[in-house]
Regions:
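Divalent metal-coordination and catalytic microenvironments
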Residues: 8, 28, 48, 63, ...
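Accessory, non-catalytic peripheral segments of nucleic-acid enzymes
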Residues: 37, 42, 247-380
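Glycine-rich phosphate-binding loop signature in dinucleotide/nucleotide-binding domains
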Residues: 35-39, 119-120, 162-165, 284-286
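Binuclear metal-dependent phosphoesterase catalytic core
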Residues: 112-124, 129, 222-287
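His/Asp/Glu-rich metal-coordinating catalytic cores
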Residues: 55, 84-218
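N-terminal active-site segment of His-dependent metallophosphoesterases
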Residues: 1-68, 72, 362-372, 376, ...
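A short helix->loop->beta-strand "cap" motif at the edges of active sites that frequently abuts
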Residues: 72-77, 166
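Hydrophobic/aromatic beta-strand patches that form the interior of the parallel beta-sheet core
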Residues: 4, 44, 78, 105, ...
Length: 380
């Protein structure tokens, strides 16, 4: 049996306030063309079907169209909700959808029940596990020692051990320790939401969603397929692809990928304003791509964003890299150490460790902790 592994469609997503819906429709049409050329026996959709828990109507219509196209091709679909999705909304109508062989994970209420498939090699069981938080698992099994995300997943898998005589697939949406992240993902401070890859040892293949870079974790058969489109400039150098998984006898799994070509690439460009507006430099190039332009001019160019968009209409982000900006970024610790706040110290450390700034929510949480620590010190 052969399957297509997809995840993190993020339908309805906006990047730098640009709607990605047309690009998403384009890439889904390309995926359908791939399926027409390369027949499969089913499709895994490993979460984050939408970008928000309450998606825009256009995104709902796009997912409806895509699932209908898969059903018309008589392809079973195995879908779960991710951390960006509303599990309740994703699960709506799931009992009816099963009549069209579209299997959607219900709202988490206990160990998933395997969906059996058969071929000449025997039975293949598919387990659908939506995005988990420890509180969800404690609610179902209050007597189990569940404190962390790793505890939560371990608890669930203890209650649904795969049949060792069958081939087994787990479709899940978690952050596995050791995987590489991108700016467009939500990852908790210190990796507290990570789970250990050893929890998946009993499964022949683990179809993961959540991380946007295509990658294996620990072994080839524990895999993130990545997003079908680039959703941040940290992904600019990535090559997106569709992941195909083929199962033979028990333990025999082969993985191949097919490249995906977006309607508009997402690229980073740098140079002086004069260079970037010289027709000889941009004629014949993909000026409609989504761009992050870094100007190297020492003096700011008046109204540069609007003027550049005359040539590059999908310019998403504009920065400068010059003597002034480099000096602004420079931190001279001995001179500033006593003048910056504890939160600023921690923010700089977090940025250095994670290559991304604290979110507003994380900063507020840290500030609250700092104030509590200071108060305890004063009261001591």
């Amino acid at each position: 049996m052969r399957f297509l592994h997809l995840s993190d469609l993020h339908l309805g997503k906006r990047v730098c306030e640009f709607s990605m819906l047309d690009d998403q429709r384009f890439i889904l049409e390309q995926i359908l063309s791939l399926l027409d050329e390369t027949p499969v026996d089913g499709v895994f959709l490993a979460g984050d079907l939408y970008d928000k828990p309450v998606p825009p109507a256009e995104a709902v219509r796009l997912l409806d169209w895509f699932l209908t196209q898969l059903a018309e091709r008589q392809l079973p679909v195995f879908a779960i909700s991710g951390n960006h999705d509303s599990a309740d909304r994703i699960a709506f109508g799931s009992a009816l959808l099963q009549n069209s062989r579209v299997y959607v994970s219900p709202v988490f209420s206990g160990a998933p029940v395997p969906i059996p498939l058969t071929d000449e090699y025997g039975t293949l069981d598919v387990y659908l596990l939506p995005f988990l938080k420890p509180a969800m698992v404690r609610h179902v099994w209050p007597d189990e020692p569940v404190e962390s995300y790793n505890d939560a997943l371990a608890c669930v898998l203890r209650h649904c051990p795969p049949d060792p005589a069958h081939r087994s697939v787990l479709v899940a949406h978690q952050f596995v320790a050791g995987a590489a992240c991108c700016e467009s993902e939500e990852v908790s401070v210190g990796g507290v939401d990570s789970v250990d890859t050893s929890l998946f040892d009993a499964f022949d293949y683990v179809a993961l969603g959540h991380l946007h870079s295509p990658q294996k974790v620990s072994r080839d058969a524990v895999r993130y397929c990545g997003t079908p489109l680039k959703y941040s400039f940290s992904e600019a150098d990535q090559h997106k692809s569709a992941t195909f998984v083929e199962f033979g006898l028990k333990g025999e799994v082969s993985i191949t990928t097919a490249p995906l070509t977006p309607k508009h690439d997402l690229r980073e460009v740098r140079g002086s304003y004069m260079e970037l507006t010289d027709r000889r430099n941009y004629d014949g190039t993909a000026v409609d791509d989504y761009l992050h332009i870094t100007l190297t001019d020492e003096q700011d160019v008046p109204d540069a964003l609007a003027r550049l968009r005359v040539i590059y209409p999908n310019l998403m982000r504009l920065d400068y890299d010059n003597l002034r900006t480099r000096e602004d970024q420079e931190i001279t610790a001995p001179e500033r150490a006593e003048s910056i706040t504890p939160l600023e110290h921690f923010s700089a450390f977090y940025q250095l460790q994670n290559n991304q700034p604290l979110t507003a929510e994380q900063a507020a949480f840290c500030q609250q902790l700092i104030e509590e620590i200071w108060k305890e010190g004063e009261d001591a």
